[in-house]
């Protein structure tokens, strides 16, 4: 077990986002978090990562490798968890390579900064995300999709035990969505745990082995992707009629009609 929630309740005035969520995430598991806009997916990611405290009372808790996130030092926590936020605060002054190297901070051993091994790891991540030709470009000059790939490369360089990814596919074209999801699947096979907020059910069906659904009333359901991804669950989750079709072994779901429209 790398990440666990116990009776986790998240709320803000007038709305409960999730109620009594108990979830265990093990090494090698790839989780999709699905739900409508505003249902609490981002708040849940932030709470799991220790950026927010659970506000559901003393019985609500999050454990990272058996301890509350706030107990770990920042460097220790960063070895356990890597977090991709929806939006990155502030502008980074340097180039892509310098930005991706920041992911090595939890592992730096020398007081003099990065070692050759750190630089090699960063360049391997840059190459994996098809950014080699942009490695020395200022990060601020990149397109939205290129910046998103640089953010994924930074997390690869960090190499945590568990990845918390809030909409990791935003801004990416179809080729690079496939590149990212293939990479995430490989990380899971290598023993990492991943939880990612997705809006495309097709990617969840193809690459994720577990699914957590957040409904608008604070209700949650979780289980294997095979159990969770079906028309009744998805129609209740998104409040629209879904069409299911199968290509090979992959199941796909697309919205068909909205009630009353």
Give the residues covered by each predicted segment.
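Conserved ABC ATPase signature
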Residues: 112-113, 138-142
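ABC ATPase NBD Q-loop/coupling interface
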Residues: 61-76
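Catalytic Walker B motif of ABC-type/P-loop ATPase nucleotide-binding domains
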Residues: 163-167
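The feature captures the beta-strand-to-loop junction immediately N-terminal to the Walker
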Residues: 34-36
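Conserved structural motif at the start of ABC-family nucleotide-binding domains
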Residues: 3, 18-20
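Helix-to-loop junction immediately C-terminal to a conserved catalytic motif
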Residues: 49
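ABC ATPase nucleotide-binding domains
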Residues: 231, 235-261
């Amino acid at each position: 077990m790398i990440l666990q929630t116990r009776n986790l309740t998240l709320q803000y005035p007038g709305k409960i986002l999730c109620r009594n969520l108990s979830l265990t995430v093990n090494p090698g598991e790839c989780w999709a978090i699905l739900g409508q806009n505003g249902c609490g997916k981002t708040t849940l990611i932030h709470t799991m990562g220790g950026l927010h405290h659970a506000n559901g009372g003393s019985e609500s808790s999050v454990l990272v490798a058996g301890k509350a996130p706030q107990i770990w030092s920042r460097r220790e926590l960063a070895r356990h968890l890597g977090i991709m936020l929806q939006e990155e605060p502030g502008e980074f002054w340097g180039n892509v390579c310098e930005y991706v190297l920041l992911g090595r901070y939890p592992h730096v051993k020398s007081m003099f900064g990065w070692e050759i091994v750190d630089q090699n790891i960063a360049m391997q991540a840059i190459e994996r995300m098809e950014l080699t030709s942009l490695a020395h470009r200022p990060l601020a000059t990149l397109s939205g999709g290129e910046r998103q790939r640089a953010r994924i490369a930074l997390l690869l360089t960090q190499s945590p035990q568990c990845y918390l990814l809030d909409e990791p596919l935003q801004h990416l074209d179809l080729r690079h969505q496939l590149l990212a999801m293939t990479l995430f699947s490989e990380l899971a096979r290598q023993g990492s745990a991943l939880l990612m907020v997705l809006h495309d059910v097709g990617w969840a069906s193809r690459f994720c082995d577990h699914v957590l659904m957040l409904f608008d009333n604070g209700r949650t359901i979780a289980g294997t992707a095979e159990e969770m991804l079906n028309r009744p669950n998805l129609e209740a989750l998104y409040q629209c009629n879904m069409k299911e079709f199968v290509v090979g072994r992959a199941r796909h779901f697309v919205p068909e009609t909205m009630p009353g429209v």
